[in-house]
């Protein structure tokens, strides 16, 4: 565009609009993101100031005017840390979408303390009326995301006991979201080319000291564009026992990638036995990034641990592992490009402006979509019929084919979610139905929690997925009558129940990862590796439990059962010290080529 034309356009716009900044103003100060070290969460003040003045999103004309000023003249808007930056450059330290402030600038997360069934019912009704986003729930609390201007309406629908029993968990949601996005500095994996990325798995057996190198891939949350090349690279370097497969196709046509890891007999003359397989998946809910990183971390640990750790080597000789980092690639990609808190898949529904089906409510066993059928805009929308969500249907088809065609026996299924630090076993749809092997499920669940506690001192609760948010805090008599968690978030039609019941996977679990609510779905990147380590240790404990031939056959009272189980236990106990010194060093520190 000619200079005179640009100048004319600029003067015309300048004369028609007041000279105010497009950056939201608050208390006579321009809105600025805090320094990277500052946290946006706050748990100190007991009551959120509901009526205080809030930041205003600039008008469309103002944003257009400022954009033209910057694009034509490249003018700086303010000085930060001695360096001039334009509005567009303010977010260059992060991959956060430009619409972040407009979408979540007025939102907060409140935690309500729940003591009675009546309070639960009141909160459920109010949440449904106002279409609120229930983030999570536990024994005696519920976290809800909402706009500041909706808080008075919510409190007005609640009994007096709840009106004063809430605290602000996240005061500045937009800032906390901003901090969760990967940093875009030159050393970040997402900013490096395929030939320069320093996250390639090391095939070296050298024992590098932890402080000498850092595992760059797990130092941040990685988008799909980085995750997929990383998976291909991992397989190319460990092709003897790792394979990249697709377990289906998404609504938008993407593959659902998975890593199959295991060591098969090399004697072709020997008929291969039925292959026992463990599935570990994550990312069913797109915004739960930590589940994607954790599945990737466990997969990397098993793949690189083969031949180095006797425990991992034994497990990969006994089982195949199928790691599915994200069963919802479309939604996961959307959280990076557009909306960090998107939950569902990206499938079209009967309402064009409300796409998406909740993948973990779309499975065929005990599907119940009646509660959300009329509202595709619901975060828990389960579709109009079972398996309407394409990704759930595709994975179910893959699983059935593995059993009927490929001679696979699924022995365990672990579905990673966030948050609240819970280990859940079937059933989720109803507490009236008890699993046939309840005692074994509880025993292994307790073992997983113990392994986590020994690794990181973090406590994970073990319970049935149907247990209510107030059940465990009330007496046993009241627990059976307590309002179930499905009142706040339906657990019918889950992958957990489907794999257990329809696929006869005797050891099925849903694990809700860190934390207990300080950050919710926006867990800081610094907790990726610690979370990965503790769940990796839990998966090793699961393998140790399942490797005994008497566990899966159910013959726990055979003449040699106790003796053989003890032999397996002794072998794994001898390996623990070696694992901690060798494999953990590789997992958390060295991934550079």
Curated annotation (Swiss-Prot):
Q: Which residues form the propeptide?
A: 23-184
Main subcellular location: other
Subcellular localization: Vacuole; Secreted
Q: Which GO terms describe its biological process?
A: cell wall organization; proteolysis
Alphabetically list the UniProt keywords: Cell wall biogenesis/degradation, Disulfide bond, Glycoprotein, Metal-binding, Secreted, Signal, Vacuole, Zinc
Q: Which PANTHER family match?
A: INACTIVE METALLOCARBOXYPEPTIDASE ECM14 (PTHR11705:SF147), PROTEASE FAMILY M14 CARBOXYPEPTIDASE A,B (PTHR11705)
- Record's protein name: Inactive metallocarboxypeptidase ECM14
User: Gene name?
Assistant: ECM14
């Amino acid at each position: 565009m000619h200079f005179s034309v640009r100048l004319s356009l600029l003067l015309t716009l300048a004369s028609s609009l007041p000279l105010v900044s497009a950056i939201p103003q608050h208390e006579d100060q321009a809105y600025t993101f805090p320094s990277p070290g500052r946290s946006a969460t706050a748990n100190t003040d007991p009551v959120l100031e509901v009526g205080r003045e809030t930041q205003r999103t600039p008008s469309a004309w103002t944003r257009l005017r400022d954009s033209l000023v910057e694009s034509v003249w490249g003018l700086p808007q303010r000085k930060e840390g001695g360096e001039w930056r334009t509005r567009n450059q303010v977010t260059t330290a992060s991959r956060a979408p430009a619409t972040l402030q407009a979408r979540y600038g007025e939102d907060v997360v409140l935690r309500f303390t729940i003591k009675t069934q009546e309070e639960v019912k009141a909160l459920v009704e109010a949440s449904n009326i106002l279409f609120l986003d229930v983030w999570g729930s536990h024994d005696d609390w519920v976290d809800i995301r909402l706009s500041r201007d909706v808080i008075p309406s919510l409190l007005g629908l609640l009994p007096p006991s709840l009106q004063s029993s809430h605290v602000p968990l996240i005061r500045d949601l937009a800032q906390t979201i901003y901090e969760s996005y990967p940093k875009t500095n030159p050393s970040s994996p997402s900013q490096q080319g395929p030939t320069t990325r320093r996250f390639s798995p090391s095939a070296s057996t050298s024992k590098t000291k932890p402080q000498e190198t850092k595992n760059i891939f797990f130092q941040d949350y990685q988008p799909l564009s980085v995750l997929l090349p990383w998976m291909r690279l991992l397989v190319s370097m460990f092709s003897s026992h790792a394979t990249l497969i697709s377990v289906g196709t998404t609504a938008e046509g993407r593959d659902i990638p998975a890593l199959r890891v295991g060591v098969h007999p090399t004697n072709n003359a020997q008929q291969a036995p039925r292959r026992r397989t463990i599935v570990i998946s994550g990312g069913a809910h797109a915004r739960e990034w930590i589940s994607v990183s954790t599945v990737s971390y466990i997969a990397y640990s098993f793949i690189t641990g083969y031949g180095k750790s006797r425990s991992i080597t034994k497990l990969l000789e006994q089982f195949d592992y199928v790691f599915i980092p994200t069963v919802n690639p479309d939604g996961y990609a959307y959280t990076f490009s557009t909306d960090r808190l998107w939950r569902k898949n990206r499938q079209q529904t009967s309402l064009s402006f409300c796409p998406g089906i909740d993948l973990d409510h779309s499975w065929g066993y005990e599907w119940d979509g009646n509660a959300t059928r009329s509202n595709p805009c619901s975060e828990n929308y389960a579709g109009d019929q079972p398996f309407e969500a394409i990704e759930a249907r595709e994975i179910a088809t893959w699983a059935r084919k593995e059993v009927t065609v490929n001679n696979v026996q699924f022995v365990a299924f672990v579905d990673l979610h966030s948050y609240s630090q819970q280990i859940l076993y079937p059933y989720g749809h109803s507490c009236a139905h008890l699993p046939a092997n309840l005692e074994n499920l509880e025993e292994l669940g307790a073992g997983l929690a113990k392994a986590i506690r020994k690794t990181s001192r973090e406590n994970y609760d073990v319970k049935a997925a149907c247990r209510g948010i107030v059940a465990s805090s009330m007496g046993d008599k009241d627990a059976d009558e307590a309002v179930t968690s499905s009142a706040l978030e339906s657990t019918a039609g889950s992958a957990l129940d489907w794999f257990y019941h329809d696929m006869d996977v005797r050891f099925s679990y849903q694990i809700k990862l860190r934390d207990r609510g300080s950050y919710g779905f926006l867990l800081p990147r610094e907790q990726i590796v610690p979370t990965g380590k503790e769940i990796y240790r839990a998966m090793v404990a699961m393998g140790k439990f399942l490797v005994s031939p008497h566990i899966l056959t159910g013959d726990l009272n055979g003449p040699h059962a106790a003796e053989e189980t003890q032999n397996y236990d002794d072998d794994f106990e001898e390996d623990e010290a070696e694992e901690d010194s060798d494999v953990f060093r590789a997992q958390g520190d060295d991934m550079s080529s």
